[in-house]
Amino acid sequence: MNYIILGPPGAGKGTQAKKIAVKFGILHLSTGDMFREAKKSDESISKLLSSGQLVPDEIVVNMVRKRLEKNNIKKGFLLDGFPRTVKQTGELDRMLMSENIKIDSVFLISVPFEEAAKRIAGRIVCACGASYHTMLLPPKEFGKCDCCGGVLFHRSDDKEEDIIRDRFSVYEKQTKPLIEYYKESGLLIYIDGLKSESDVFEQISGCIINGE
């Protein structure tokens, strides 16, 4: 059970990845979580993320490699936010090949920019990793996390439309070539990201259960 989940900013990758990992008992590896942790102590990464730009391939690959080596991935894993470039894809292939591990499926959650921007603008998060939406998935108590009671906030790269548009543009330029790569390899599965969160979850779960 080894999977990759792709999609533009605001597609709901992180939300779905966490739920899928719990349901099937596999490891969730999120580069987004890794970056947000790293930016606390690395000013260069912080500046890149705040401007909507991609972190250099060498840094990303090294972070993922360390995380894969640190965790037991024999039971399966779900990569969320990686790979994002053709170079990262090649590095991932080499990493997995050395361990005789293969990717079973690549899920692409597809949503247009307008919908993604709307979702991002309303997204609020907690330091514990929980994510909410002011309209679509509000917390039980305004401004307070249901999981730990922490204060909810907007991520810095979610606040300005120009940054959101830049992030989407970077995705279009850097990540879309991967779609063709995984399509040609027969691993790509399209997921309609405009459906409800529960419907998207059921669609991905169904594909995994059916061995697609």
Swiss-Prot record:
E.C. number(s) listed in UniProt: 2.7.4.3
Organism domain of life: Bacteria
Residues given in the record as Zn(2+) binding sites: C126, C128, C145, C148
A Pfam family it matches: ADK_lid
Subcellular location: Cytoplasm
Positions contributing to ATP binding: G10, A11, G12, K13, G14, T15, R123, S131, Y132, K195
Reactions mediated catalytically: AMP + ATP = 2 ADP
Binding site for AMP: T31, R36, Q53, L54, V55, G81, F82, P83, R84, Q88, R155, R167
Keywords: ATP-binding, Cytoplasm, Kinase, Metal-binding, Nucleotide biosynthesis, Nucleotide-binding, Transferase, Zinc
Main location: cytoplasm
Example GO molecular function: adenylate kinase activity
GO CC annotations on file: cytoplasm
Residue numbers spanned by region LID: 122-158
Region (NMP) residue spans: 30-55
Enzyme class: transferase
Family listed: Belongs to the adenylate kinase family.
SUBUNIT field: Monomer.
Name the UniProt record assigns to this protein: Adenylate kinase
Gene: adk
